[in-house]
Curated annotation (Swiss-Prot):
GO terms for molecular function: magnesium ion transmembrane transporter activity. Residues 49-66, 110-117, 181-183, 246-259, 312-329 are cytoplasmic. It is a multi-pass membrane protein. The keyword Electron transport does not apply. Pfam families: Mg_trans_NIPA. It catalyses: Mg(2+)(in) = Mg(2+)(out). GO terms for biological process: magnesium ion transport; transmembrane transport. Homodimer. The gene is NIPA1. It is linked to Spastic paraplegia 6, autosomal dominant: A form of spastic paraplegia, a neurodegenerative disorder characterized by a slow, gradual, progressive weakness and spasticity of the lower limbs. Rate of progression and the severity of symptoms are quite variable. Initial symptoms may include difficulty with balance, weakness and stiffness in the legs, muscle spasms, and dragging the toes when walking. In some forms of the disorder, bladder symptoms (such as incontinence) may appear, or the weakness and stiffness may spread to other parts of the body. This is Magnesium transporter NIPA1.
Length: 329
């Protein structure tokens, strides 16, 4: 009786494990470490590129000739490579929100390189963003719901995901060819929407390339199909990155780098998590407590980002607040 019960329990555990694979603690730690470093590197890219654009405008030359702009571009490439490695190690919903750490880092860097203001509320926002990121790490799912190339192909052909991609493509065409030429230079949300919607392609493509590469490297029977899938995803990823790169630089030419970085994080993260939820179904392994924890963490990060940006023009510090309190007394 006991043996039969144990066998049944083992079978149930095996069946549950088929749909979700939990990476080893070492893999999770490594993936988180790479994601954190990548977010900091990515946080510096907008600032360095903006600095290069400003320097080039002063000289009356193209920013393509400025070494600081190229430093920011190289940093962006390094950050994206780091994200690719992180996505192959841990779930997307664990990596993407950590981009929040790049926002306060970029704001601090911008206060030195671009002389942008960072008052006491901005510093509080930096603290909240970091605290919210920790909450996200604690409550994010640690198991993978898609672990093979065959599962990935099945998810990619899911009617819900195909419908979502069609809507995204339609919105991108509308934004790029109609709205952006007329309103892009005056409305920051136009360029941010284009770059963020493209995240619906870049992040799932990156994750998919990692899964397909496993079959290719292990020379599985399905390696030929995996190679074709990998090439298609590489093409999608390459096109998405090129378009993103173009509109990020357009935005930096017209708007404050910190404001762009902050709003971009919130919109990009929201859309990427939506695309990942539809494609990879990683949220299916999240309980109510963890879901609420992630919602609170993301809200904390968003509030921190708002504090960094919305109140950046307010000229006050703790000394002035103490003086006003003394006068009141």
């Amino acid at each position: 009786m006991g043996t039969a019960a144990a066998a049944a329990a083992a079978a149930a555990a095996a069946a549950a494990g088929e749909g979700a694979r939990s990476p080893s603690p070492a893999a999770v730690s490594l993936g988180l470490g790479v994601a954190v470093v990548s977010s900091l590197v990515n946080g510096s890219t907008f600032v360095l590129q903006k600095k290069g654009i400003v320097r080039a405008k002063r000289r009356g030359t193209s920013y393509l000739t400025d070494i600081v702009w190229w430093a920011g571009t190289i940093a962006m490439a390094v950050g994206q490579i780091g994200n690719f490695l992180a996505y192959t190690a841990v779930p997307t919903v664990l990596v993407t929100p950590l981009g929040a750490l790049g926002v306060p880092f970029g704001s601090i860097l911008a206060s030195y390189l671009l002389k942008e203001k960072l008052n006491i509320l901005g510093k509080l926002g930096c603290l909240l963003s970091c605290a919210g990121s920790v909450v996200l790490i604690i409550h994010s799912p640690k198991s993978e719901s898609v672990t093979t190339q065959a599962e990935l192909e099945e998810k990619l052909t899911n009617p819900v995901f195909v419908g979502y991609l069609c809507i995204v493509l339609l919105m991108l065409l509308l934004l790029i060819f109609w709205i952006a030429p007329a309103h892009g230079p005056t409305n920051i949300m136009v360029y941010i929407s284009i770059c963020s919607l493209l995240g619906s392609f870049t992040v799932p493509s990156t994750k998919g390339i990692g899964l397909a590469a496993q079959d290719i490297l292990h020379n599985n029977p399905s390696s030929q199909r995996a190679l074709c899938l990998c090439l298609v995803l590489l093409a999608v990823l390459g096109c998405s990155i090129i378009v993103q790169f173009r509109y990020i630089n357009k935005a930096l030419e017209c708007f404050d780098s910190s404001v762009f970085g902050a709003i971009y994080y919130v919109v990009f993260t929201t859309l990427v998590l939506l695309a990942s939820a539809i494609l990879f179904r990683e949220w299916s392994n999240v309980g109510l407590v963890d879901f609420l924890g992630m919602a609170c963490g993301f809200t904390t990060v968003s509030v921190g980002i708002v504090l960094i940006q919305v109140f950046k023009e307010f000229n006050f510090n703790l000394g002035e607040m103490n003086k006003s309190n003394m006068k009141t007394d």
